[in-house]
Amino acid sequence: NQEVAYIKLHNLHWYVKGRSFFTLHAKLEELYDQTAEIIDAVAERLLAVGQAPVANMKEALALATIKELADKPISSEETVQGLIADVEYWIRDTKEIVELADAAGDGVTADQFNDYLGEYQKLLWMLKSYIV
């Protein structure tokens, strides 16, 4: 999902329109940079525990449960609403990963994803505050 989210954040960064363009354009760049760091850290953790990360878009798209966006302009309001929906998904997905890691006795992975969970929860709060 993070690989698809990374591309989706670029899409929003390029196609967002409206009065909040400058604010959202900058925030979306920050988010896709953070997402790239997360993708790298997760891939390295997977390799460290003997697993294989997804490293091609065909497989990423086949496995992803979040949806891509069309290459067309999107309003500031729709951008934030879509981000809220995606971040809520990231939170659910991350909680599930923490539970699975805990059940497997992998505290390192659980800790890593708990850190992401805190960041996603903070981002969700900020996005919801933005649209009030």
Language-model segments: which ranges?
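Acidic/histidine-rich alpha-helical segments that form the ligand environment
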Residues: 40, 44, 61-114
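Short alpha-helix boundary/capping motifs
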Residues: 30, 56, 63-74, 126-130
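A structural signal for well-ordered alpha-helices, especially hydrophobic packing surfaces
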Residues: 6, 13, 32, 39, ...
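Long, contiguous binding/interaction regions
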Residues: 16, 21, 33, 53-61, ...
